[in-house]
């Protein structure tokens, strides 16, 4: 019976740990609300296996002095460390200081591009409960932004963007807003391309 429970703990920790590691890696590129709920459930199950292992396997190790008794705990520590490191790296990308942030609101979906001060960017292509992320690098010269990719997710159709003022007329007033346009090599706005609002501008 003791060996059977030990095998259950090892298999359980391996299964839950591998699933959590896989999902943590996938969260760098995509998040879905039901995946987050499933991830939270796996964390709870993993904690149950870990607590069970801490009480049972440490007790057996003290009594038998066999290193094999600590294998489940060791596996759990490896998985926990891996998940923590990857999660820290993912969050560090999002936490970098923003230079410019632009956004397109499509109603039920939207696309935001966060241009970081270190020359990297993150595209967040979102819909209800779902976000897909794309990473890349860029260069900025005045109001022109040059991306490392020619096209991105059927939203950005060029590698050149430009910040330009746009006069917006309302029934009772007229305002000037900064819009980010997609342009070609000659600087012409590409017809029917998505326009972005400039929501954060930390340029000096």
Positions of PLM-derived features:
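Lipid interaction determinants
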Residues: 2-117, 122-134, 141, 148-204
């Amino acid at each position: 019976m003791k060996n059977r429970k030990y095998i259950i703990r090892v298999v359980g920790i391996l299964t839950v740990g591998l699933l959590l590691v896989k999902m943590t890696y996938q969260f760098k590129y995509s998040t879905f609300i039901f995946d987050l709920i499933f991830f939270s459930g796996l964390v709870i199950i993993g904690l149950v296996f870990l607590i069970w292992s801490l009480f049972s396997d440490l007790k057996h190790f003290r009594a038998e002095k066999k290193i094999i008794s600590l294998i489940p705990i060791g596996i759990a520590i490896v998985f926990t460390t891996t998940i923590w490191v990857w999660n820290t790296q993912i969050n560090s990308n999002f936490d970098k200081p923003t230079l410019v942030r632009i956004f397109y609101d499509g109603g039920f979906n939207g696309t935001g591009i966060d241009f970081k001060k270190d020359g990297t960017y993150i595209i967040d292509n979102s819909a209800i409960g779902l976000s897909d992320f794309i990473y890349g690098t860029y260069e900025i010269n005045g109001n022109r932004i040059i991306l490392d990719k020619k096209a991105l997710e059927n939203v950005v159709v060029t590698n050149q963007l430009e910040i330009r003022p746009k006069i917006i007329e309302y029934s009772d007033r007229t305002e000037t807003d900064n819009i980010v346009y997609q342009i070609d090599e000659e600087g012409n706005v590409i017809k029917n391309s998505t326009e972005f609002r400039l929501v954060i501008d930390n340029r000096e």
